[in-house]
């Protein structure tokens, strides 16, 4: 965009052999009536407009900062018309809601404390390269427009996504990766922070292992995202954050409005705090040694009523200040006990985990279910399986158009013993569900290995600290109970941080498995999920201006010890996938030639509809010729497969058919036998006993050899079309005849 009124600055992000990215900040041309507005470009083909405005007067009766952050995804940005009935954008997509949360979390702590004027930040996606991720650009755009607005905001705040991308020269942390680059990365994380002296203080982290990370690590030898590697990624993000902050500061120095004096409403005055502290501090220390949450809350509420009543006459009309001061004194008492005595609210040490309970198959008829309990936090996980055509269709600016694994998180008000609204999910519930989903996606089987759409629901039945990480554990249990062949079990833990001045020094204490109160009174909520080998998801929020990376690195190591302990509990409840529930649909895959798709469908769908009607199966066909067959039972699915093969694959073997095959390979567990060109089956070592007069076979080569002809019968075809074989011995052949054999030579002449 051009014009004499435009002022700009640029941040050049150098990724070495992966090239450079240019982030350009502009102001002065668009949205001139907003308090602050900025256009932000990445490489000139993705553009976002951020506008920050503030209410003229403080909101009456508000005891919190009313900040609203919104993202408007315009489909014209990608050259598309919305797919809704009215062909117009409606409610925000899940991606937009998650982007709002990414922006809100680092920005909110940067506003002056006590601000009660409404502040709204709106980021509109005006143009986007389909290969770009706009969410991290939006963090910088919202920070830039807020800096320009004249609001009491201690920015700038820079945000960057870094991905551990592998190529022939090794792995490197790449800033602002594209969607296509993420396919070759094992881990990516969004890191937001601010410049603090000569360093960068980290304010927010959102990280995940990628969908393809397991294959890249196990099959291609890529670097696994261990705690040490993740810590290196946090350090790698710092120079990029500094470059972004410097560019914002440069433009703000030239174009920002003078900071406006807004009325600030402190929660209490010093005289109120001193009176409450004198009346309540010693008693609070005793109250917060009660381990049970409900007993502790009851005692705390009673003490609060006692203190406010006794001081009401002294501070008439200042009841709200008394209540706020009581909370602040409570916070100070709890934090000082942790830092000085290394003892927490419920009497645990800093690294102690509450009692854990894991149980599977807790509901009848559902496909998979489990309950995971950590102290008073109780999560029920429920898994539902269906055909792939039931996967979620996505209409957003992302190139991802469908999602096979859907994770929904519900947080009813009774989970904390309260009343409240029940209905559509709020942003918090959407965010928690997305976090649990990201933690589990890396260990899910591929579509080919497990051709099912998977819906996982986490019900928070009781809450006292980290229901999102409890959801990860419950989901692992539930999916294994449903028969989902996870590549590894995943567990999650929430870490906390308390920092304060003790004897003139700043001390940090990292807490394992935080309570709800420790989350409220602490400085950090740091959630880490992963397998026994590596990290799969991270979420960090802080109330401080930033946290040293060294403190986060230590917390990561502490979280790993807790995660391994939780995984032991999960494995003791269930360590391998169960059989599919009798109530779950049976989904099998058949591969047919692409030029046969029309024949299977038939004119106006006549053939496929007839097969579905005759067998009771549900059939869907992919463009590559993969046919997915779903049915309520195995015989229906097998009947549909036979009908499809009769049309498209007339030479495809079926159960019970006999072949004179040729041994093409021997292994320690059996021999592979070629039945027809391109179609092999496994003759397991346990079946070879029939060829050795019933004797145990220890060495396959002692019974059969490559090139030998063997008469076999197909005994099983699994969901992926793999064939299991059994040898046909002379007695069976003589008794039953060879009328079903598909041999090119008479069965009697076969040399075994």
UniProtKB/Swiss-Prot annotation:
The enzyme's E.C. designation: 2.7.7.8
GO terms for cellular component: cytosol
Catalytic reaction equation(s): RNA(n+1) + phosphate = RNA(n) + a ribonucleoside 5'-diphosphate
Major localization listed first in the record, in broad terms: cytoplasm
KH domain residues: 585-644
Record region (Disordered): 727-752
Source species, domain of life: Bacteria
GO biological process, one term: mRNA catabolic process
Entries under InterPro entries matching the protein: ExoRNase_PH_dom1 (IPR001247), ExoRNase_PH_dom2_sf (IPR036345), GPSI/PNP (IPR014069), KH_dom (IPR004087), KH_dom_type_1 (IPR004088), KH_dom_type_1_sf (IPR036612), NA-bd_OB-fold (IPR012340), PNPase (IPR012162)
Cofactor: Mg(2+)
Binding positions (Mg(2+)): 519, 525
Ranges of residues in domain S1 motif: 656-728
Subcellular location(s) of the protein: Cytoplasm
UniProt keyword annotations, A-Z: Cytoplasm, Magnesium, Metal-binding, Nucleotidyltransferase, RNA-binding, Transferase
One MF annotation (Gene Ontology) recorded for this entry: 3'-5'-RNA exonuclease activity
Keyword Transferase: yes
Family of the protein in this entry: Belongs to the polyribonucleotide nucleotidyltransferase family.
PANTHER family linked: POLYRIBONUCLEOTIDE NUCLEOTIDYLTRANSFERASE, POLYRIBONUCLEOTIDE NUCLEOTIDYLTRANSFERASE 1, MITOCHONDRIAL
Purpose: Involved in mRNA degradation. Catalyzes the phosphorolysis of single-stranded polyribonucleotides processively in the 3'- to 5'-direction.
Protein name in the entry: Polyribonucleotide nucleotidyltransferase
Encoding gene per record: pnp
């Amino acid at each position: 965009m051009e014009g004499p009124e435009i002022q700009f600055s640029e941040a050049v992000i150098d990724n070495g052999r992966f090239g450079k990215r240019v982030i350009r900040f502009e102001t002065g041309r668009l949205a001139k009536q907003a308090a602050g507005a900025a256009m932000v470009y990445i490489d000139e083909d993705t553009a976002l407009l951020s506008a920050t405005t503030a209410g003229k007067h403080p909101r009456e009766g508000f005891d919190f900062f009313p900040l609203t952050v919104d993202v408007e995804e315009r489909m014209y940005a990608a050259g598309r018309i919305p797919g809704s009935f009215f062909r117009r954008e409606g409610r925000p997509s899940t991606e937009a809601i998650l982007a709002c949360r990414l922006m809100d979390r680092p920005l909110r702590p940067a506003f002056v404390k006590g601000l009660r004027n409404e502040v709204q930040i709106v980021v509109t996606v005006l143009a986007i390269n389909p290969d770009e991720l706009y969410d991290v650009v939006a963090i910088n755009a919202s920070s830039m427009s807020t800096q320009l607005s004249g609001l009491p905001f201690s920015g700038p705040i820079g945000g960057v996504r870094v991905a551990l991308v592998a190529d022939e020269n090794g792995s490197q942390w790449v800033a602002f990766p594209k969607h296509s680059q993420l396919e070759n990365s094992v881990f990516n994380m969004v890191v937001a922070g601010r410049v603090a002296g000569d360093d960068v203080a980290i304010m927010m982290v959102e990280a995940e292992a990628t969908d393809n990370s397991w294959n890249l690590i196990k099959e291609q030898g890529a670097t696994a995202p261990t705690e040490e590697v993740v810590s290196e990624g946090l350090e790698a993000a710092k120079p990029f954050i500094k470059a972004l902050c410097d560019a914002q500061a440069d433009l703000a120095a030239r174009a920002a409005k003078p900071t406006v004096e807004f009325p600030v409403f402190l929660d209490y005055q010093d005289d109120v705090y001193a009176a409450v502290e004198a009346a309540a501090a010693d008693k609070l220390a005793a109250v917060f040694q009660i381990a049970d949450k409900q007993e502790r809350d009851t005692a705390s509420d009673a003490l609060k009523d006692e203190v406010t009543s006794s001081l009401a006459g002294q501070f008439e009309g200042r009841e709200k200040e008394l209540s706020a001061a009581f909370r602040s004194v409570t916070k100070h008492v709890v934090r000082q006990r942790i830092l000085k005595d290394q003892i927490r609210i419920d009497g645990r040490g800093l690294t102690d985990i509450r009692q854990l309970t894991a149980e599977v198959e807790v509901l009848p008829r559902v496909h998979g279910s489990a309950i995971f309990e950590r102290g008073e936090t109780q999560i029920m996980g429920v898994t539902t399986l269906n055909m792939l055509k039931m996967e979620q269709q996505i209409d957003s600016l992302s190139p991802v158009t469908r999602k096979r694994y859907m994770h929904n998180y519900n947080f009813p008000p009774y989970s904390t013993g309260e009343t409240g609204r029940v209905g559509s999910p709020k942003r918090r519930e959407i965010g928690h569900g997305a976090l649990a989903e990201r933690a589990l996606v890396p260990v899910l089987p591929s579509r080919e290995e497990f051709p099912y759409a998977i819906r996982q629901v986490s019900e928070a039945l009781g809450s006292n600290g980290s229901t999102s990480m409890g959801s990860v554990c419950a989901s692992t249990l539930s999916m294994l109970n449903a028969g989902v062949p996870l590549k590894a079990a995943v567990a999650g833990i929430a870490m906390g941080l308390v920092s304060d001045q003790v004897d003139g020094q700043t001390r940090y204490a990292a807490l394992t498995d935080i309570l709800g109160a420790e989350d409220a009174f602490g400085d950090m909520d740091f959630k880490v999920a992963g397998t026994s080998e590596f990290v799969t998801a991270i979420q960090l929020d802080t109330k401080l201006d930033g946290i040293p990376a060294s403190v986060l690195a230590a917390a990561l190591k502490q979280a790993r010890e807790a995660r391994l302990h939780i995984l032991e509990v999960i494995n003791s409840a269930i360590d391998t996938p169960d059989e599919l529930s009798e109530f779950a649909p049976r989904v099998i895959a058949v591969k047919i030639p692409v030029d046969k798709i029309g024949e299977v469908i038939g004119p106006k769908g006549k053939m496929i509809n007839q097969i579905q009607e005759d067998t009771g199966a549900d059939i869907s066909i992919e463009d590559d010729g993969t046919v997915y067959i779903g049915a309520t039972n195995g015989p229906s699915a097998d009947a549909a497969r036979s009908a499809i093969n009769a049309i498209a694959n007339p030479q495809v073997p079926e159960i019970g058919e006999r072949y004179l095959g040729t041994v093409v390979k021997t292994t320690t567990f059996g021999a592979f036998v070629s039945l027809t060109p391109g179609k092999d089956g496994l003759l397991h070592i346990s079946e070879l006993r029939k060829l050795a007069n019933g004797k145990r076979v220890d060495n396959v080569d002692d019974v059969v050899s490559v090139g030998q002809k063997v008469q076999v019968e197909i005994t099983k075809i699994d969901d992926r079309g793999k064939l299991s074989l059994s040898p046909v011995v002379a007695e069976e052949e003589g008794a039953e005849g060879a009328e079903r054999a598909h041999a090119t030579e008479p069965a009697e002449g076969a040399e075994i």
